């Protein structure tokens, strides 16, 4: 066996040779800077298009711009940027959501002579976000941000930032009309072009410097590898802040004159079928799909025979994949499924090309275009292949970083070539440690090269990858170490992928503080493992595959006092930890057995199977006593349970409220039996909806917003599992035969009595969202009048004086507000449609909203026009109750949480509208800024940050 040889020879003429290949089918004009790329594309292919589908749930249409129009717009935008009066070469942090906005901002910065730095989505955890922004500010020595209104709000609490809005810049750009080749300054190939931030999985982010030369070297080679031409059509849904989204799927195709369609990730992830529809509709040739999407598409579509033969997929020639390993059987199943879905399977011929790349290498630099339909993969995961032109790879001894490994032996993967980054910005130490002699970049990955083809076998770096996103293991371990039952410094989390598993997971190894053979070991182990799982889900959205307790005297540390993840994982794979795993399973079975009840009736068994399907459990592991929300159920899962239950039991409807009230298998089964056999009479109204019941701390009572419903709280309630019960209060009128409330006093009396029935005595913690805030305030007053202690009254984005606002809202306004809250219409539509709709009948107005509503959202909410009409009446009844509301009296203390208001500035909202709450509190009133806007502060993106802030205020009040 011979030492691993370099695969591609890098010479000073590599870019020239690529340019020669490029020019053979194009023109003698060869771009050498990014400026040239844009000019060339606009001049040579003026009518070719950039297409965009935004993140809006209300508009999935494709918006297009020709290369010529885009070129003109971004040059005017660049000219407007000059008015910032920044020195040439200044760094502008670009923090935007949509592809079109990001693309325009990056090109404008470049053309204005600035250096854009693309900022990924900021953390929802306030401390982490503030630490990152402060780090970026110090790293660049400046703090100029170009963002949108939502982005500005996210960083508004951080001092010292110079924030500019893209919307204002666009308005300023309308005053300019520069030439089609305008630039503010001349640049050279080795000048800084774009900065990309690393994931920060092992600490604060580093800023990767890519020059015009490194980007063009990568893009020339990528285009050659993909077979791009000016007739190609590209589909991208990777975020523009990622090198794959901006360089691989935008600049590389632009260099070759290829048309592009950029889709916000949410549009694909919420409806994977859209991926195939777009391939068909736009004759896509090259697209990107990570392993988890390949697997999801296959699972969702392989059994949908009604869709077979529905799509024209003959255009697609290549699907790139990256971010995580591609499972060979998944790739084969995906290809087979696409052939079944195609109108003409014989014309479906494409490669799935897994690749290796990093931010430092301009994304993919090693590819394996595999036709899995004609050749059998050699391994469980598809190999990653060979380098693109200009790139070299080698495998070396990770200890010294230079000694080559022989063919077939694993070691550290290193790459070099003109597409490798030049340096980390303002971080000479990290740059130096990333390279070894000869310009080889140390990737931190462990690989094997056989016959010139590379595959990965592990990572040196301390991360775990979940759906292509890297999470830092040390940070996760820090939080896991805090769990009661874990011996301090004797816990390690290690990445792990089980044989046949589609995505990577991880294992937690730890030494328990208690004796595994002690009298109460089962209950202690159960509590410890439940807490470890809860923290893992909250931190990285994934529970551990295995949790292995090992007696402390059997957990060996290195001479430096550290646990070796590699050693522990090796012992696990070799079966050396089997006795500890068996003991843990025995104890957990004992603990679970104490409360486990085998589903007995056919209804219970059917529900157990539905629960198992939703949570990926074995049916035999679902107890009749299992609670839907304690298993991890979300608001989306509630809708799925509702749909599957209605289908399984042949019921026209299972009311959502009944699922919320009966989340336990046996309880829901009893309700369904009653519904099927004799129908369920309208039961006595009870506003209390128990969203989760575990934990010993003071319960939370959360009052509904102005729409009356409480599903908005389901995701928030999950964060209080094993800490404190979480009850929501739902308005009256949703169920048949229930009258609406007719006054605020009637509502408050009902809610206060319900709270007392649920928790007989204080101290109480009660809060309300929006309209529910004033109701919560009144309930707190009522409880105090009964002689009870209310230690926490939380008011979420609502002022004390609401009567004037209630009088402003007519039926049309209320209907549009509700429709926006439910995600049926956009905020702009809700604001703009009212004047033209008011002269119409109620039915006509509802028809307009119905036509604007995304069909998938209507299905998700199980809405009909009649149900929407009734819901508007419920919301209207609450508005009527608030029209005469005049706050008075006081409570012991108030905690006010404020977000971006529906109208006006946040500063005015706080100082003029919310500060008057001080008149109604006998103690100090706190005012806490929370992420998001009025209608989004508890959505999936913002609830992780909100719950942390909300919990901190509970703790501050001694709860």
Curated annotation (Swiss-Prot):
One BP annotation, GO: biosynthetic process
UniProt key word Phosphoprotein: yes
Region of interest (Thiolation and peptide carrier (T) domain), residue spans: 603-673
MF-aspect GO terms: acid-thiol ligase activity; transferase activity
Top-level taxon: Eukaryota
Pathway annotation: Secondary metabolite biosynthesis
Residues the record lists as O-(pantetheine 4'-phosphoryl)serine modifications: 635
Keyword annotations from UniProtKB, A to Z: Phosphopantetheine, Phosphoprotein, Transferase
Pfam families membership: AMP-binding, PP-binding, Thioesterase
UniProt temperature dependence: Optimum temperature is 25 degrees Celsius.
pH profile of the protein: Optimum pH is 7.2.
PROSITE patterns the UniProt entry points to: AMP_BINDING, CARRIER
Residue ranges occupied by any Carrier domain in the UniProt entry: 598-676
SMART domains: PKS_TE
EC numbers, comma separated: 2.3.1.-
Flavoprotein as UniProt keyword: no
Ranges for region Adenylation (A) domain: 59-466
Sequence segments annotated as region (Thioesterase (TE) domain): 699-946
InterPro entries: AB_hydrolase_fold (IPR029058), ACP-like_sf (IPR036736), AMP-bd_C_sf (IPR045851), AMP-binding_CS (IPR020845), AMP-dep_synth/lig_dom (IPR000873), ANL_N_sf (IPR042099), ATP-dep_AMP-bd_enzyme (IPR050237), PKS_thioesterase (IPR020802)
Physiological role: An L-tyrosine:2-oxoglutarate aminotransferase (probably invD) and atromentin synthetase invA1 catalyze consecutive steps to turn over L-tyrosine into atromentin, which represents the generic precursor molecule for the entire terphenylquinone and pulvinic acid family of pigments, which are widely distributed secondary metabolites in homobasidiomycetes. The first step catalyzed by the aminotransferase converts L-tyrosine in to 4-hydroxyphenylpyruvate (4-HPP).
Family the entry assigns: Belongs to the ATP-dependent AMP-binding enzyme family.
Listed name of the protein: Atromentin synthetase invA1
Species, as recorded: Paxillus involutus
């Amino acid at each position: 066996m011979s030492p691993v040889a370099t695969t591609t020879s890098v010479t000073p003429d590599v870019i020239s040779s690529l340019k020669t290949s490029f020019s053979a089918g194009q023109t003698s004009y060869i771009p050498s800077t990014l400026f040239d790329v844009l000019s060339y594309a606009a001049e040579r292919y003026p009518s070719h298009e950039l297409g965009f589908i935004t993140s809006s749930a209300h508009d999935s249409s494709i918006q297009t711009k020709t290369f010529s129009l885009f070129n003109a717009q971004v040059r005017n935008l660049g000219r407007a940027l000059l008015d910032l009066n920044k020195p040439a070469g200044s760094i502008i942090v670009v923090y935007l959501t949509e592809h079109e906005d990001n693309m325009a901002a990056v090109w404008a910065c470049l053309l204005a002579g600035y250096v854009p730095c693309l900022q990924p989505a900021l953390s929802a955890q306030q401390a982490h976000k503030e630490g990152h922004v402060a780090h970026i500010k110090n790293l660049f020595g400046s703090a100029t941000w170009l963002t949108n209104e939502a982005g500005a709000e996210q960083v508004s609490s951080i001092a010292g930032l110079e924030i500019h809005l893209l919307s204002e810049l666009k308005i300023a750009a309308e005053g300019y009309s520069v030439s089609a080749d305008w630039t503010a300054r001349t640049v050279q190939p080795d000048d800084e072009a774009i900065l990309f931030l690393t994931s920060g999985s092992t600490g604060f982010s580093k800023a990767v410097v890519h020059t015009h030369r490194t980007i063009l070297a990568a893009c020339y080679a990528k285009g050659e590898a993909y077979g791009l031409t000016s007739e190609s059509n590209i589909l991208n849904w990777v975020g523009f802040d990622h090198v794959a989204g901006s360089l691989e799927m935008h600049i590389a195709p632009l260099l070759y004159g290829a048309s592009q369609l950029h889709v916000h990730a949410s549009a694909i992830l919420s409806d994977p079928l859209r991926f195939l529809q777009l391939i068909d509709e736009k004759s896509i040739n090259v697209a990107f799909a990570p392993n988890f999407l390949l697997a999801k598409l296959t699972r969702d579509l392989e059994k949908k025979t009604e869709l077979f033969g529905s799509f024209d997929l003959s255009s697609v020639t290549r699907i790139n994949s990256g971010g995580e390993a591609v499972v060979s059987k998944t790739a084969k199943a995906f290809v087979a499924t696409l052939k079944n879905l195609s109108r003409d399977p014989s014309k479906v011929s494409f490669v799935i090309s897994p690749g290796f790349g990093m931010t430092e290498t301009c994304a993919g630099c090693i590819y394996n275009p595999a036709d899995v339909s004609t050749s059998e993969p050699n391994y469980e995961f598809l190999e990653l292949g060979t380098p693109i032109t200009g790139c070299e790879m080698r495998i070396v001894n990770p200890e010294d970083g230079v000694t080559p490994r022989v063919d077939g032996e694993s070691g550290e993967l290193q790459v070099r070539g003109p597409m490798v980054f030049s340096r980390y910005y303002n971080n000479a130490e990290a740059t130096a440690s990333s390279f070894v002699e000869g310009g080889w970049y140390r990737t931190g990955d462990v690989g094997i090269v056989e016959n010139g083809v590379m595959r990965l076998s592990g990572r040196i770096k301390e991360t775990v990858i979940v759906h292509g996103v890297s999470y830092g293991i040390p940070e996760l371990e820090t939080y896991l170490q805090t769990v009661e039952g874990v011996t301090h410094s004797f816990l390690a989390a290690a990445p792990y992928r089980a044989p046949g598993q589609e995505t990577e997971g991880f294992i937690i190894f730890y030494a328990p503080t208690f004796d595994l053979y002690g009298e109460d070991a089962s209950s202690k182990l159960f509590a410890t493992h439940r807490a470890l799982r809860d923290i893992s889900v909250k931190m990285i959205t994934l529970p551990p595959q295995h949790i292995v307790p090992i007696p402390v005297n059997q957990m060996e540390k290195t001479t430096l006092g550290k646990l070796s993840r590699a050693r522990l994982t090796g012992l696990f794979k070799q079966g050396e930890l089997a006795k500890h795993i068996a003991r843990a399973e025995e104890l957990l079975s004992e603990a679970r057995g104490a409360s486990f009840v085998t589903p007995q009736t056919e209804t219970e068994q059917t529900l157990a199977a539905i629960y198992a399907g939703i949570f990926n459990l074995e049916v035999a592991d679902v107890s009749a006593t299992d609670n839907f929300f304690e298993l991890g159920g979300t608001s989306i899962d509630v809708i799925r349970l509702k749909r599957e239950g209605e289908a399984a039991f042949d019921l026209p409807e299972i009311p959502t409220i009944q699922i919320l009230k009966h989340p336990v298998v046996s309880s829901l089964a009893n309700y369904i039996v009653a519904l099927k056999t004799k129908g369920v009479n309208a039961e006595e109204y009870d506003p209390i909806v128990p969203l989760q019941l575990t934990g010993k701390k003071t319960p939370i009572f959360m009052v509904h917003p102005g729409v009356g419903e409480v599903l908005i709280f389901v995701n928030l309630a999950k964060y209080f599992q094993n800490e404190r019960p979480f009850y929501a209060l739902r308005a009256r009128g949703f169920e048949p035969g229930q009258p609406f409330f007719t006054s605020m006093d009637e509502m408050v009396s009902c809610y206060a009595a319900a709270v007392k029935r649920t928790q007989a005595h204080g101290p109480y913690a009660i809060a309300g969202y929006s309209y529910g805030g004033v109701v919560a305030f009144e309930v707190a007053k009522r409880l105090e009048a009964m002689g009870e202690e209310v230690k926490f009254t939380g008011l979420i984005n609502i002022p004390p004086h609401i009567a004037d606002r209630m009088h402003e809202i007519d039926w049309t306004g209320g209907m549009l507000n509700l429709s926006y809250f439910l995600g049926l219409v956009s905020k702009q539509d809700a604001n703009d449609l009212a004047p033209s709709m008011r002269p119409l009948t109620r039915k006509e107005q509802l028809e307009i909203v119905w036509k604007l509503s995304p069909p998938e959202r209507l299905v998700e909410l199980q809405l009909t026009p009649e149900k929407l009409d009734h819901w508007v009446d419920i919301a209207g009844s609450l508005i009527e109750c608030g029209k005469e509301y005049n706050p008075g009296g006081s409570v012991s203390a108030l905690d006010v949480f404020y977000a971006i208001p529906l109208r006006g500035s946040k500063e005015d909202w706080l100082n003029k509208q919310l500060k008057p709450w001080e008149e109604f509190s006998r103690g100090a009133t706190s005012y806490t800024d929370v992420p998001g806007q009025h209608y989004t502060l508890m959505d999936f993106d913002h609830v992780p940050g909100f719950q942390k802030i909300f919990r901190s205020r509970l703790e501050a009040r001694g709860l």
